[in-house]
């Protein structure tokens, strides 16, 4: 498919130009998202999504779409920010890309192959296209780098951590950071140290517990495979199952492929990894599709309860990303059995997808907040390379 462009917050006008701009790139396995911001990382001037493998043609198509939305912005790029999912144990904050940084990203790619490989490919294309400006890698893992040790350590033999670096990293950090920041603003001064749970629900899914803007727990772990049920990924699974499959003759590569690409909504429903198609099938009476949606909601709901307990209470629940933002049915299903915690949503507000869908002002607030990973990448690029 071709590019979808948007002029974002400031639509292009004839004769409009910007003196300097920041380009952001978010490369996935099958899509390339790009945006240009003003040089203060405050205003999105244009955005584009190319729905195909992010190769050289897709990259140039994205730039053309951005230029059409904000004439002059591409020639005015003064820095490029790249979303990189996994930075490993060494890259704990956004950083200017150097040969060493690139090598480090390559070294941890096997822990997030669906994400780091396209990011590295896009990084190479962008550095060739914009050789004279700083390139910044903004890591999804960075937001969780300072979690308490008890949230990071797995109860496995200690030498696994020392010898192989086994620990919890957490992912979708850029999304969780923005959502929690926006939730705190919506809560206002009523809560000076708010306890917030963020559910990032899309093709990839994760939850996090955030106290006063700092994450204290998250569902994804050493890799983006742990935690909630996802579009094609299983989420948390009894490790004994993997041992059983290996002893039964299934290869490591086959297990890797099936847990990453054939599980989750797709594997359970037998219909699709696309939540919308599974929902349609469930409404048409497909029992496996209904089971898949029930499992999806159950796992997300369990995470909310666990995180609220870990924080000693909850002030706000945030839904973000594709399913979280666009599915009133899934939001209602997740919250349905959490009324005992003070979580109640207004049905009409939920159907309209309003930002605040809370039913009672004195209860736990529930927000629907659009994901803005591009904005966070732009901010990190400004802070790291241009401040």
Give the positions of each predicted feature.
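Short glycine-rich, Thr/Ser-proximal phosphate-binding strand/loop in the N-terminal lobe
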Residues: 22-57
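Short glycine-aspartate micro-motif
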Residues: 22-25, 77-81, 136, 196-200
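Glycine-rich beta-strand-to-loop/alpha-helix junction loops that act as flexible
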Residues: 27-28, 82-87, 201-203, 318-326
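Short beta-strand-loop/turn "lid" adjacent to the catalytic site in phosphate-handling enzymes
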Residues: 70-116, 133-136, 142-153
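Internal helix-turn-beta structural module
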Residues: 290, 294-315, 324-387
